[in-house]
């Protein structure tokens, strides 16, 4: 081979090497901004170890959300800074075995004890972790609607009753002292407890009657809420007067009382009872506008009320909520694990979950506010599985915004973003998301996969193209390198992930790691606490209904040819005031006074000896309570008849 030919081949080889390897490197260096179309990436191991707290699983000091595990799963890095987390996993994604049970395991074994509230639809978490928690010093409680005979008890009205009893106690002290300074002190304390009981009543009624964001006209739910507030207040007033026992103040008893109002006779009786109460009484002030509604409107309100309260007809629910055997704020005073076990095949029970969450949260806020630092002595994690299957938690925006500062951390488990939107609406859902980190486990829907892909963001990648032509005596070639955007993970890639977890903390880039199942964690111990059997009771005797009310019967000088029913006797008591007014004006001009009945309403017919004088007629009209009574004057021969009717009782 001649030297010129060898030289040509060497030159061509150098050009090819240059074009294929060296020029792309030069072009890459020349690119001005390799983040031009996006800078998304996953955190590096170095960044994870720098940003999060490392703990030895054999000696855990303080628990956060597990972000990363060492290969041998002897060490874990916790996120202790992100206030709350949303766990996104469709049905069958392994939320319990990869997220809930590991979290409970860490809490049980940590030196710094935190209480834990767990919604546990299948009872799976209780079965797998309760003994481990107990062995590590935890108080174990269950509210078990699957097995009510094994459940603890929680009277939903207990906090309200306790507050009202303090009001009664200090009111009695006020009446029994002549010391002016003590009177001021007792008066202020009494009224503060009364105000707090009213606040708790309003809060509970709001929790129970809360409607989804795209629900009915708010008028109906607000009216049903007022009905519940009024009935709770009525029960407390009856308790104060000694007419009912403490054990009769339950949600089921209130439900039965309202049911007993469904027939016309009992409804009228209750209206008369309200008429007798003084204005300023909580029950009267709340119920008066409702009982004065027209019949159709009132029936619609009671329809909403009955729909929301129907759950308390359930015998299991009635037994569990008939009394309380623990204090709601115990979770903020002593390391406690409370499991809420509900039949997940019947979503109506999730209403009770929302109610219990709201009650305990309110009690823990009160407890935290008593501390100088406004924080719980024993902090708490809320592990809320099937969160978006529950009716909305009232004022959830405030909960996620301020609960961290009080020592409360929430873990919300949902199946999709759409599920959250359906319960809270897009605006409130976004507030929840803005206050939470996100842990992605698995999805079956493309919409959710697209949302996760979008949240991960885009990265900038290179795109190279080469065109070349080689001839015997010449070479023509061209290579170009450009930048373009690509999703860090496409929706299809997100959807196809298997046993992988993506975590979006508030600090740093997203984290991509293998999913760890609880039985791989060396500090986990299997075991279930044996619970005491509590036989169910027939609670019929504890219900307070209108039929069971004992009305006061007073003597009267009026004559009657009829044997008046208890209801008519109550009407008679109200009519007596008007009769006395007329008697004081007409004195000895009355011949007789009789009770009559018209359209099942009692009225009084007063027969005078003579015709009533115009002057006396004017005086009677001026003195009689025209808001309560309606007068009719008629003449028959030389005598006058006065009819005294009750107006609408409420």
Q: Could you tell me what each predicted segment is?
A:
Residues 70-72, 76-408, 423, 493-498, ...:
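P-loop NTPase motor domains
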Residues 1-93, 97-105, 110-112, 469, ...:
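Basic- and hydrophobic-enriched, low-structure N-terminal and domain-boundary segments
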Residues 186, 604-606, 620-622:
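Short linear proline/tyrosine/threonine-rich motifs used for host-factor recruitment
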Residues 568-579, 583-587, 591, 621, ...:
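Residue-level detector of alpha-helical secondary structure
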Residues 588-602:
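Short edge beta-strands and adjacent turn/loop segments
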Residues 132-134, 330-332, 429-434, 622-625:
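Short, conserved catalytic or adaptor-binding loops enriched in Gly and charged residues
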Residues 613-644:
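Intrinsically disordered, low-complexity regulatory segments enriched in Ser/Thr/Pro
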Residues 400-402, 406-503:
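Conserved ATP-driven motor cores of ASCE-family P-loop NTPases powering translocation/secretion/packaging/pilus
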